[in-house]
A protein has these predicted regions:
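Intrinsically disordered, low-complexity regulatory regions
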Residues: 1-132
């Protein structure tokens, strides 16, 4: 059987990490929206700046906030995982402090509205920095 984790398709660098975005999805039992956010926070693409990722993260958070305003959340919050395991999982990623905060908000804040709003604010800060 082919080792699909030994390479990636496209310009992302997931395969060079011990823990890939798939591992985060499975460990934290993420819904599709949160899995997409996690992927965008973790990835580095040789062909793109982070600007587009931050814009997409902000957009996805906006959609989740819209869903939450419409009624009860159809998705469960991420499964709690000990912080020490989280720290081990991100160890070989060169995350900016803002990116780590994005991930922590996504994975650990139980108030989902607060999590998504915080993430939008962090993205606004990163977008402003990248455009300056």
């Amino acid at each position: 059987m082919e080792n699909v984790r030994s390479y990636n398709v496209g310009a992302s660098d997931y395969s060079k990490h011990k823990y890939q975005s798939w591992d985060f999805w499975l460990t934290f039992v993420l819904n599709p929206f949160d899995a997409d956010l996690c992927k965008r926070i973790l990835r580095t693409k040789a062909t793109d700046t982070r600007l587009l990722d931050y814009q997409k993260i902000k957009h996805i958070c906006g959609e989740r906030l819209r869903q939450l305003e419409e009624g009860p959340d159809k998705w469960v919050s991420p499964k709690y995982v000990e912080k020490s395991h989280f720290e081990e999982m991100i160890l070989d990623y060169s995350l900016l402090e803002d990116d780590k905060q994005l991930l922590e908000n996504l994975l650990y804040l139980q108030n989902r509205k607060e999590a998504y709003k915080n993430m939008q604010n962090i993205c606004d800060k990163r977008i402003a920095y990248l455009l300056s």
